[in-house]
Design a protein with these regions (language model features):
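N-terminal "arm"/small-domain region of PLP-dependent enzymes with the aminotransferase-like
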Residues: 28-97
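His/Asp/Glu-rich, glycine-adjacent segments
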Residues: 5
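Conserved N-terminal alpha-helix of the aminotransferase class I/II PLP-enzyme fold
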Residues: 80-122
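Conserved PLP-enzyme active-site core in the AAT-like
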Residues: 34, 39-47, 51-53, 71-74, ...
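Short, positively charged and aromatic/hydrophobic N-terminal segments
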Residues: 9, 16-24, 31
Length: 307
């Protein structure tokens, strides 16, 4: 009990001081102060690569569209010239140190996170990475019954044990609602040693819960909070929207930038702001599940959409 009280005090102080720097409409944070959100490092690197007209002795095999002329004629040569492979001038998605590294810093800054990662396999990849980062085989994870199928995939891959919360049903309009404080407290009481709480916010019907209260409840019991924000990529950018996972102190979230943020289909983001989940663990999981041939077209679209 003493340990939990101490943990709760530390968490509340941590959230207070962090939120002094993370205010909706004033994106920032002392660690990333001064970042210019007008910059597009990945897109700029690709522009330089295309302008230099590099002779390709590397993949992809279509060679700037020469190998698929019918497709090139339809979509245009420029997009196929942008379809490049990892190299020093363009950076490497699996271990970024250049343009992608700078772009991901800007992304974290924009989303009020401590770190952020480009995803080219949708929020499905982000959801699975969150669960695998937070849970070991046998760990219990509390989640809503109406979670996306990617959540079930993450549970299978991690070996975690699901504990389901049945969301309330609005009989008038016939849809499931969000998770309530009471239902979460009940699930935690029955599973006090659960490792994480997984939430969908907003739901796929656009329903939002009192995320701030749910995060506070979970953290009070030393449980990490993971949030599927697939349909909430836009919510960080206007004060009239509900608070996001990063803004209320959740540990990780994944958002489909392609759904409501303007990037190309399949491109999403993974966001981390946690004292409970090590960044190195997240990187290890991503390196296990992430392609070694990330699309620069998709990453450039994330870069420009964030701007």
């Amino acid at each position: 009990m003493t340990k939990r009280i101490f943990f709760s005090i530390i968490h509340l102080l941590d959230c207070f001081f962090r939120n002094m720097f993370f205010i909706k409409g004033e994106v920032g944070g002392s660690k990333m102060a001064g970042l210019d959100q007008k910059k597009t490092p990945v897109l700029d690197a690709i522009k330089r690569y295309v302008d230099e007209n590099v002779v390709q002795f590397h993949v992809p095999g279509h060679k700037k569209g020469k190998g698929i002329p019918e497709f090139a004629e339809y979509v245009g040569k420029r997009v196929l010239q942008m379809d490049a492979n990892g190299m020093d001038d363009l950076d490497y998605a699996n271990n970024p140190t250049g343009a992608i590294y700078e772009a991901e810093k800007l992304l974290a800054h924009a989303y009020h996170a401590e770190s952020a990662y480009f995803l080219v396999n949708g929020t499905t990849a982000g959801v699975q990475a969150m669960i695998m980062s937070a849970c070991e085989p046998g760990d219990r994870i509390i989640l809503p019954r109406n979670a996306h199928k990617s959540t079930i995939g993450g549970i299978i891959l991690s070996g975690a044990v699901p504990v389901y919360i049945q969301p309330e049903i609005n009989e008038e309009i016939g849809i499931s609602m969000g998770i309530t404080e009471e239902s979460l407290k009940s699930a935690i009481k029955e599973n006090p040693h659960a490792k994480a709480v997984f939430l969908t916010n907003p739901t796929y019907y656009g329903i939002t819960s009192d995320l701030k209260s749910l995060v506070r409840i979970a953290h009070r019991h030393e449980m990490a909070v993971l949030v599927d924000e697939a349909h909430g990529a836009h919510m960080s950018f206007h004060g009239d929207f509900p608070l996001t996972a990063m803004e209320v102190g959740a540990d990780m979230s994944s958002a489909s930038m392609h759904k409501t943020g303007g990037s190309l289909t399949q491109s999403s983001v993974l966001l981390v702001r946690s004292n409970m989940i090590a960044t190195e663990k997240v990187k290890q999981v991503l390196n296990l599940t992430y392609t070694s041939s990330a699309s620069y077209i998709l990453m450039a679209s994330l870069d420009i959409a964030r701007k």
